[in-house]
Amino acid sequence: YVFVANETGVEMFDSGVWTWDHVDHFHFYRADARKIGAVPGSGVAEISGGLLSTAGSTGVFFPGTGDAVLLDNAALADGDIEETLRIDTGARNGLIVPLGAGALVTEASTGSRADQLRVIAADGAKGDQISCEEPAGSITTRVGVVVGCADGAVLAVENDDGGIALEKITYPAGAAAPATTFSARKGRPTVAGLGSDAGTWLLDTREQAWRWIPSETPLLEAASVDNEAGHVVTVGVDGVVRVYEATT
């Protein structure tokens, strides 16, 4: 899907191209592109997706009101817009990330700036929470859901018993600026993160560890594309595509 956010809501388009993840291989599909519709809201929304486009949910956070919305992906695939969850977070910054049948949602413990994350069940029931100052950026890996914070990242993992474990993966001492966006080949356990400094973070969600890869040129985009060699494909402000290999 393509989500076009502006000050009055989010317009949604079905690209007609999608994949289905079978862990060791992918199935690729194509259909006619079409406009699905729009969800009205206040402020340019933050969009968070999962691993699949035709199952699970997509999260939409409206900063103007603090509303956090989950959209059903199966309904979007049929050309319909169906909200499965809508809550008022009380924050004017943040996100809502699909997590199982529910979501991981930012909250403000005081004031209107988000400073923590909370597990919300499909029926809206509140679960555990964990601190997360200045939340920004999210991605779903095979291990769990990642949300960036000022001091690291929160990793939310579904347990075998259906519970959710929340862990903070802190940056090393003297670290570069925090990552505010994350990108990787779909489902990879290691993801690349970009912040304001020249270089890219690598977050290994299996080992729960960060690695910093500096670059001479500031980067516009960075994506982790494999696990074993730690390859990261980047695009610099000079328009040059570079591939980095992480080293210990």
Q: Where does each model-flagged region fall?
A:
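Repeated scaffold domains used in trafficking and secretory/extracellular systems
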Residues: 1, 7, 30-56, 85-101, ...
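Loop/turn residues immediately N-terminal
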Residues: 7-11, 65-69, 102, 110, ...
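Acidic, serine/threonine- and glycine-rich low-complexity intrinsically disordered segments
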Residues: 107-227
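Acidic/His-rich segments in extracytoplasmic proteins that coordinate ligands and/or metal ions
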Residues: 5-49, 56-61, 65-76
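Loop/turn-rich, solvent-exposed surfaces of beta-rich toroidal or solenoidal domains
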Residues: 220-248
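Short loop/turn segments immediately following beta-strands, especially the blade-tip
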Residues: 13-25, 71-78, 157-163, 205-207, ...
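Structural core positions within WD40/WD-like beta-propeller blades
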Residues: 3, 59-61, 103-105, 146, ...
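A charged, solvent-exposed segment within the mature domains of Sec-exported extracytoplasmic proteins
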Residues: 55-110, 123
